[in-house]
Regions:
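Intrinsically disordered, low-complexity boundary segments flanking structured domains
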Residues: 35-39, 69-74, 110, 137-142
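Membrane engagement elements in two modes
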Residues: 25-33, 37, 64, 71, ...
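Alpha-helix termination/capping residues and helix-transition junctions
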Residues: 12, 75-78, 116
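Short, conserved sequence motifs used for protein processing/export or organelle targeting and
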Residues: 85-270
Length: 270
């Protein structure tokens, strides 16, 4: 996987790059739409939603985006709306000898690919382009109204002795033929690390959630296709970094194509 390292900009320039959303702007809160789409066996398959939050430890408005994600997950259910915080770009922080950094080279690659111009910024099921955080609630509502074309199940087998996890991603076609890429990521919750706050202060004990750690497979996934009624299993192995807390690590798997994310699933490794 090609890794691209980007030079971090100065703090002053970074601050001016962070999007500033007026607090007076209100979220659009809506009822949950129906998302049921039974397969041939009568099993109800729900299309889940992926929020890719392009964030950074030096972004003063990014904690606001984290709060909005929490509200969305409270409204729709954290099992139905899966968030991944991709620390990246000029406002991302790769760390020092004394301070924990959460930005990754792969995250920077995604940041550049999507042409992110401000942070916080996000993708909701990769439909509708780059959105500021005040637009996420409506985008989630719109995405939730669509039917699932496949189901995804994740089976994780973690070995404490060598800190490796065997990941089985099981997919089943529900309707039509789905072609695209199967992407598998590792994320971690409850990481305590520095974060710039909306009031300009620095919180050294900020708790970061759903932090993108690495791509288990290629940065852009593996080629994937599935027909209605077809079942497939893809198996991967990941060795955890020594600094990761296994109890807080989850696997996120999703299938995407030119029409966006078709299905997504998340499961903790322990």
């Amino acid at each position: 996987m090609k890794k691209i390292i980007y030079i971090l900009m100065g703090v002053a320039m970074a601050m001016t790059s962070c999007s500033d959303i007026d607090e007076s702007e209100r979220l659009l809160n809506v009822d949950k739409p129906g998302t049921e789409n039974p397969d041939d066996d009568g099993q109800v398959v729900t299309r889940k939603i992926l929020i890719e939050d392009f964030t950074g430890q030096k972004c003063v408005n990014c904690p606001k985006a984290a709060d909005i994600i929490e509200q969305i997950q409270n409204d729709y259910g954290a099992d139905n709306v899966i968030a991944v915080g991709i620390h990246s770009g000029a406002l991302g922080f790769h760390g020092t000898a004394k301070l924990v950094g959460l930005a990754t080279d792969t995250g920077d690659e995604y940041y550049q690919h999507w042409g992110i111009k401000f942070q916080p910024a996000g993708l909701v099921n990769r439909v509708g382009g780059i959105l500021n955080h005040e637009q996420w609630m409506k985008a989630v509502h719109d995405a939730a109204g669509q039917k699932a074309s496949l189901s995804i199940e994740i089976g994780n087998n973690y070995n404490d002795a060598d800190r490796t996890v065997t990941i089985n991603v099981r997919t089943k076609g529900v309707s039509g033929n789905t072609e695209g890429k199967l992407q598998v990521w590792a994320i971690e919750d409850n990481i305590v690390a520095m974060q710039k706050m909306p009031d300009g202060s620095t919180n050294k004990e900020y708790v970061h959630k759903h932090v993108f750690r690495t791509s288990v497979n290629d940065a852009w996934g593996d080629n994937f296709s599935i027909a209605k009624g077809e079942e497939k299993t893809a198996t991967y192995t990941l060795k955890l970094d020594g600094k990761w807390v296994a109890e807080n690590v989850s696997i996120v798997a999703f299938v995407y194509n030119g029409d966006g994310v078709q299905q997504v699933e998340k499961k903790s490794i322990k």
